[in-house]
Amino acid sequence: MDHFHTRTHNLKGTISPHVQQNIKYTTKVMQDCNDLVQKQFKIGTNHEISLYIVYMDGLVDTEMLQESVIRPLLQDSFPQERTAINQYVIESADWKWIDTMEDAMTAVLSGNTVLFLDGEARAILFSSKSFPTRGVQNADQEVAIVGPKDSFTESLRTNTALIRRRIRDTRLKVIQKQIGTRSKTDYALMYIDDLVQKDILNKIQKQLDKICVDGIFDNGMLEQYLEKDSKTPFPLYQLTQRPDKVASSIMEGRIAVVLDNSPMVLLLPVTLNVFFQASDDYYNRWEITTFVRILLYMAAIISIGLPGFYVAIAGFHPEVLPTPFLLALISAREGVPFPVIVEVLLMELSFELLREAGIRLPGQLGGTMGVVGGLIVGQAAVDAHLVSTIVVIVVALTAIATFSIPNELFTSAFRLMKFFLIILCAFWGLYGFFLGFLAIFIHLFYLENYGIPYAHPMVEERGRLSTAFQDFMVRYPLKRMKYRPEFTKEGARVRQKEDEDEK
């Protein structure tokens, strides 16, 4: 028997017109579910109509349920006609008829209330969700000095509302579905209908529909199921906790996947360039943003290549150094028993462990652990003549460069590539250094994301100068950014009208 595709209970049956049958069925299916609340009532002038209400404790707004559903039904004036029930529950914010037990049980487990009516072969679903969740808080992972401070929560509807609040356009679509055969996690696709490329949208929808797994609990999991090329360390999707970033991305023709229970929203498609765009890039003047972006691209090269470059120079090609630098290197390494490669790996791995320890420790203690631990370990290693002072400086500069890159998933790929270059340089010196960088660049240039080159706009598939260069290393003034990037469908790339005064 295929235990994955076989349901524990057969939920495909239709709803019985006899309330007692529905009670027996629900009790059997939901056996040992002590958080299930079941209530039976007799209503009508002569109390001849049986009702059965089912919901999960802790997932519903009981006050709303009592005031809008139960109290009207218990009125003595309730008519004998069963079809008149909708007139007495119209105060409920949202309700509808459902026909199968599968829909009924799924609704109950999703935080809704289901009412079974004797003599009616269908049930009424009341929207009564009231999940325990935290409120909207500051974005702690993508801090911005200028601009909005709010961030997403674990509530799907709260997150879609934060986006809808910023884009008050009827063409902003929200397509809601479920994923996971057991978790039945709600998710929503959000896009602007006249900006999105329909072929990309269709591909994403087909990918999501094909995912057959028992549970999806975070967009980080969903990202891994969506990616086609799992042989690259570079992220092919973007995760963010900032509603303003999602709103601006949607207005560029991109698609957002909002997953219930996840405080991060998935953006796709992506290119290499979007990972260097900080949250407040568009709230600052273009000169400042351009300067910062150039620094970030330099930081990316340093974070990947500096340790390997030091291994290549100190271990294979010290003759390329000017004499004062060479003497300083020899003096710094005096008394160190290990070769250069062991020095660098020892310090890099130590800093990686300190970084992980800082992440795992709670609150401010984690940041303190990272800074103080790094200083203590580095100084102790130098005093013990296990490593040279130059190696500590190299590793520290590499760490600073890595932390300056805005996207955490992207920096994780850089951390792996750093060790790749260190190993190559340990065997072949500068030849390994340049070959390694060449291999990384070739890999990036060959990657694609839904038909869009990953290295766009450095790689342009249409053989013409891309409008994306206006938002690349140099960020043009906002008045000159008249076109949307290549994510947008053809014919909808104009973002703003020409200023007659500037002609």
Go through the PLM ranges and name each one.
Residues R122, P132, Q141, P148, ...:
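Glycine-rich, flexible loop/turn motifs
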Residues A300-V320:
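Hydrophobic alpha-helical segments embedded in or immediately adjacent to the lipid bilayer
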